[in-house]
Design a protein with these regions (language model features):
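Amphipathic alpha-helical segments typified by the pilin-like N-terminal helix
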Residues: 1-15, 21-23
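Short, well-ordered helical secondary-structure segments
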Residues: 15-16, 21, 41, 88
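Periplasmic/extracellular, small/polar-rich flexible segments of pilin-like filament-forming proteins
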Residues: 29-133
Length: 133
């Protein structure tokens, strides 16, 4: 696959997953919970495109949500976004933090689930690196 084509296809996934992260933060601010489906986010993102399939994984305790952009074509990297709850040590307020991660190598395998901490430093799953904004 030509580099320009590959970068353009990967750009779609970066934008979609990043948009899902932002939408989850807005959804949490309004409903005090995360959306369990892409449709509930109401941002017009399809769950399937020619290059990627998109999904949401919600933690059992509603402390984090993971958006996944899984490559459907060889040679493309996967993307995952994580939005996690952070409790303030000074009071009992809760805020959200997000991170966008890219697979280190092209893959069609699902990413691992995040290991959330109570700090703003959300870790990318194993085999993934932070996408700098």
């Amino acid at each position: 696959m030509q580099d320009q084509q590959k970068l353009a296809r990967q750009s779609e996934a970066k934008q979609y997953v990043s948009s899902m992260n932002r939408a989850q933060q807005a959804f949490y601010a309004e409903y005090a919970s995360f959306a369990s489906t892409i449709q509930k986010l109401g941002i017009g993102i399809k769950s399937e495109t020619e290059n990627y399939s998109y999904s949401i994984v919600l933690s059992n305790d509603n402390r984090w949500v993971q958006a996944i952009g899984l490559a459907k074509r060889d040679g493309l990297k996967n993307y995952t976004g994580i939005v996690s709850l952070i409790k303030s040590p000074n009071d009992e307020s809760t805020s959200t933090q997000s991170r966008l991660c890219e697979s280190n190598q092209p893959s069609k395998e699902l990413p691992g689930t995040p290991t959330p901490t109570n700090s703003p430093d959300i870790q990318c799953p194993s085999g993934y690196s932070d996408v700098l904004k």
